[in-house]
């Protein structure tokens, strides 16, 4: 029996991606737009903040989190008792229910025209993203008192994530010990000190599946040494989705950026061969760190036909 954690937003949210505050960004105006699905480091950091004991800190953000948390699986959305899962085609993101994911393995084996028609219907007819997701735009400035003008680099616009319906983010954890410590907590969630409430309950779910195709519920991290091989043979591993560079966030305790890695983004459809590929490419020097990434939520694969998960390295 696992623990299901519902993260219930209490106000509009901001889940930053890389981009708006990168070293190469210059000019008088910076802008941020929230992700729809928070990245694993955001959720693990939120849980770690509740559980953190200063005396147990190691100075390494990843080790500190994995010492506090057991394996996290996720993330997807629940609204009105229905689960919605991310599905990605390039820059396009949809939220679809499992009833329509079930048809994907058959659809992916069809001829090109039939396959494209079926995928089009998923993204434009079956997509529930716009039924539940809204946005809230805000602008912030800083005034130079001496000139009464906006300071350079301090004109800031942000598009927050808002909701048309009651929405919960869903993750699963396999640790009974921490569930009582987090259940009912009001926590900061994402950027800009947004808040959410946590609710925990028991849930039976399989975490040892073998399938031909998987949905990625969180980014699948790729070591730099394997990137050329992956991109040269991308159709062997990724059926639809997107590969991109992502930031693992900001290390507040040490006031520095966390690492940036290449990833197959959440919502992608990958083949079983990606599992053997990553296992082969992660050498002994990388294994410990990439296993820790996996523990805090990265590399979550889901069965397309039922609510069942697996990781890649463990």
UniProtKB/Swiss-Prot annotation:
CRISPR (clustered regularly interspaced short palindromic repeat) is an adaptive immune system that provides protection against mobile genetic elements (viruses, transposable elements and conjugative plasmids). CRISPR clusters contain spacers, sequences complementary to antecedent mobile elements, and target invading nucleic acids. CRISPR clusters are transcribed and processed into CRISPR RNA (crRNA). The CMR complex degrades RNA complementary to the crRNA (target RNA) within UA dinucleotides, generating 3'-OH and 5'-phosphate ends. Keywords: Antiviral defense, Cytoplasm. This is CRISPR system CMR subunit Cmr3. It comes from Saccharolobus solfataricus (strain ATCC 35092 / DSM 1617 / JCM 11322 / P2) (Sulfolobus solfataricus). Part of the CMR ribonucleoprotein complex, consisting of crRNA plus Cmr1/Cmr2/Cmr3/Cmr4/Cmr5/Cmr6 at 1:1 and possibly 3 Cmr7 dimers. A Cmr2/Cmr3/Cmr7 subcomplex without crRNA can also be isolated. It does not cleave target RNA. The keyword Cytoplasm applies. Belongs to the CRISPR system Cmr3 family. GO terms for cellular component: cytoplasm. Pfam families: Cas_Cmr3. Signal peptide: none annotated. It is found in: Cytoplasm. GO terms for biological process: defense response to virus.
């Amino acid at each position: 029996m696992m623990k299901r954690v519902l993260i219930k937003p209490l106000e509009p949210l901001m889940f930053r991606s890389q981009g708006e505050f990168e070293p190469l960004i210059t000019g008088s105006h910076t802008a941020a737009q929230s992700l729809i699905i928070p990245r694993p480091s955001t959720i693990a950091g939120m849980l770690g903040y509740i559980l953190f004991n200063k005396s147990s800190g190691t100075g390494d953000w990843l080790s500190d989190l994995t010492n506090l948390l057991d394996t996290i699986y996720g993330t997807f959305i629940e609204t009105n008792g229905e689960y919605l899962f991310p599905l990605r085609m390039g820059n396009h993101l949809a939220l679809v229910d499992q009833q329509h994911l079930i048809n994907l393995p058959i659809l992916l084996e069809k001829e090109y025209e039939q396959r494209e028609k079926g995928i089009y219907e998923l993204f434009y007819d079956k997509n529930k993203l716009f039924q539940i997701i809204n946005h809230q735009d805000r602008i912030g400035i800083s005034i130079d008192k001496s000139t009464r003008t906006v300071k350079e680099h301090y004109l800031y616009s942000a598009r927050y994530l808002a909701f048309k319906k009651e929405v919960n983010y869903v993750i699963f954890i396999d640790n009974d010990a921490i569930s009582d410590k987090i259940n009912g907590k009001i926590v900061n969630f994402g950027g800009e000190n947004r808040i959410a409430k946590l609710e925990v309950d028991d849930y039976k779910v399989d975490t040892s599946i073998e399938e031909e195709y998987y949905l990625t519920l969180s980014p699948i991290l790729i070591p730099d040494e394997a990137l050329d091989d992956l991109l040269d043979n991308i159709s062997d591993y990724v059926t639809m989705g997107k590969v991109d560079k992502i930031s693992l966030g900001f290390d507040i305790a040490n006031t520095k950026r966390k690492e940036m890695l290449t990833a197959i983004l959440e919502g992608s459809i990958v083949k079983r061969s990606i599992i053997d590929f990553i296992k082969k490419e992660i050498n002994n020097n990388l294994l410990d760190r990439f296993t820790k990434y996996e523990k805090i939520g990265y590399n979550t694969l889901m069965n397309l036909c039922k609510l069942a998960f697996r990781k890649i390295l463990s």
